[in-house]
């Protein structure tokens, strides 16, 4: 008897037992005796990851049992034994085996010998499989398994499938590595794989690397998807030259659909045990995160006592009109970020903001109430607290003909702990009238404003007035008009630059007039700081501002023209490939900067440029050159070459000491920070060595002092199921006592970081340590359109 004849006979017996044809012609798939049986349900559907809905499941339950085998033995219409290349499909279950016994009354199939079992969630090879074809309850013996929808595989002495999507594995292993790769795996007495919750739970588990046990856990859960579930996550291990051996055990809390938290127990060999908690929430008032860190006793710095940090970030919109924002951070001491790695901040933090805002926004107006304070992380600095500020803005576009009107106003209360500084209440009103005009190739916006400010200034212990220490008035009001006219032209060239680039020219001019008003009876009213004012950087885009200072404590007088132009170059696809902008302010009555008694006729030249050649060579540069004193004030330049395996970037930053002194208010001696200004060169690169290896390097150097600022080198290995990283870094640290730059030997903090991560277990889980991130890092300061 031929093979095809035996298969037909076995299938015919299945029809007698189950009353449904096992051979079917669906109208599009012809039955060919030479090719054997054609099943209506193909193997691709059996192996689908799609979870059937209730209706689909009911339809599958009504589908016939499709059987193919070399031979069959039937017994009393109650069971049949199929032998030789047995193949069964029922709904989304598929079984291939040397022999299968079908029990009609119980609807149970017992497969033995080289059993391949496939369902919607799992594919296995076993010695024996017993399955209920109706309920899909299944037992497998001596099984190698692979999940269909996740990169998970392993072996198990016994597999039990209960319900539709839950598997229980006994004496089992678990890994996300590809076949024949046991770089890492879990071995456990019991593993529960819940496909609906997308989590795996291990009991009496040990973690092995290259078959070597690393650690034992009596209980642990890991995600096999993105679904959240409470449980102990995979521990983190690392090696840090600052903290020694590190072990972190995270515990995830799925509190509610819109609340969760992760508590991490961090053991640091040289520091002690730290508790770290991240709480996340989502409500109708917005979303936010609360982070808290606590180290009861720092073994390395015992004199600093318990060390802690906390932060709260919130942002949300309520009923389309209300907006809430909170940014609050606080740490136990000013050296916290220097001594400890933290998720709250980095070692280059100079202060932590503590602010909150509540806003109501309508079509024509908005109102905001805000409070703001700072924790200063340097000694002997006491910034002002804003307690509180109420801001009101009104907008009336085209309120009369083509004229626009808007009103900006606020009332602010400033307090400070510095007894040498006044506290104050400030009221500011600023109505503005403008006439925006434009055509296809031009725009012109004349506008006029009136700035009215009232102050009530108080000293806690010193009188304010003509005899006060700062010669300030207790009450003072100031009214300053402002006129501003801004115009621009947009021109396209009819000839292509270099035969392939469309060039545009965009000249721009602005006239600004602000009369000179004596403001010396206001704290900060001479341009040397104030309650919330500081001088703004005068780059190209700053040439066309109407203010030299943030805040309103000092309004610099102005009678000036700002002139500039931008030229852009586009390729045939209208992608911007290059631009260059340059400009200058021409002063008619001096610069208005009372601080320097300036009587010069022009500002420094400002220029910005960006370049993109064929999407692999990028450049950005900017300079400010003061021709009045023949001094380069500010310069920055970045050149980056990108290729298929990585990039290399060189950058340089220069700021003259005179520019720093003129634009930044230092309460301390500037020589403690710099003797000559900023002369900083950097070189950064990443390179992929083949498919798995990557190298990373960073180096920053002070070219004036001829000393390294920071350096970092790292290597990373990335495979299909795990990654390894080793990073070494050196960072220049400030001296413990106040010393003038250049009078002491530089000191560096060295860190060696080891990181190991396993892949394929959801988005947020892995064995990993922290990274040796430096204060200076890679950036892409390229601003071309498209």
Curated annotation (Swiss-Prot):
Biological processes annotated in GO:
Gram-negative-bacterium-type cell outer membrane assembly; lipopolysaccharide transport
Where is it mainly found? membrane
Family annotation (Pfam families): LptD, LptD_N
Concerning its family, UniProt says: Belongs to the LptD family.
Q: Where is the signal peptide?
A: 1-24
Q: Where in the cell is it found?
A: Cell outer membrane
InterPro entries with a match to the protein in the record: LipoPS_assembly_LptD, LptD, LptD_C, OstA-like_N
CC per GO annotation: cell outer membrane; transporter complex
Protein name (database record): LPS-assembly protein LptD
Q: Describe the function of this protein.
A: Together with LptE, is involved in the assembly of lipopolysaccharide (LPS) at the surface of the outer membrane.
